[in-house]
Amino acid sequence: MALKDRFDKIISYFDTDDVSENEVHEVQERTSVQRDSRAATAQEASQRSHMTNSAEEEMIGSRPRTYTYDPNRQERQRVQRDNAYQQATPRVQNKDSVRQQREQVTIALKYPRKYEDAQEIVDLLIVNECVLIDFQYMLDAQARRCLDYIDGASRVLYGSLQKVGSSMFLLTPANVMVDIEEMNIPKTGQETSFDFDMKRR
């Protein structure tokens, strides 16, 4: 009976749109019935405390179990779930972060044709992307200006700019390490020479 009353209370809590006076009286009657049932269960509990252990075991075996509401139980369960989640989460986050680091490293290949393309290259560095820049479609003077702008931006953003070919440079953010050994770059017929230090000859 008490369980049914609890369900009725829960349902009536959500059904407040069509409240009428009859329902208010019904709720008051239910409340008085609940008080009576609580008093009856309290009397039964006091009677059970006076019985012997064997009689009590027989009575428990013949009646269905009743559960008492513990307001702190939900809080304890929530805390236990949170603790279990926090203990399991660092391991998962570490594995996920390694996967994300492997997946997030991308290299964009850019062939700038005019000086204004340098801003697009720097924007890629800002979002932590590596950029391989090939200046083969630019004139020497424009390429020097563009390279100077990109080099300045990479220093401000703590990136690095490295020469990897006769007209190619690799621009990397601070979190990417590049290990380039001495490379002998063969002359491919392009007579343009781009110097990393931007010295004029």
From Swiss-Prot:
The UniProt keywords, alphabetically, are: Cell cycle, Cell division, Cytoplasm, Septation
Region (Disordered) residue ranges read 27-99
Signal peptide residue numbers: none
Keyword Ligase present in the record's keywords: the answer is no
GO CC, sorted alphabetically, is: cytoplasm
Respond yes or no to whether keyword Transferase is given for this record. Answer: no
Recorded family membership: Belongs to the SepF family.
Q: What is this protein called?
A: Cell division protein SepF
Q: Which organism is it from?
A: Streptococcus agalactiae serotype V (strain ATCC BAA-611 / 2603 V/R)
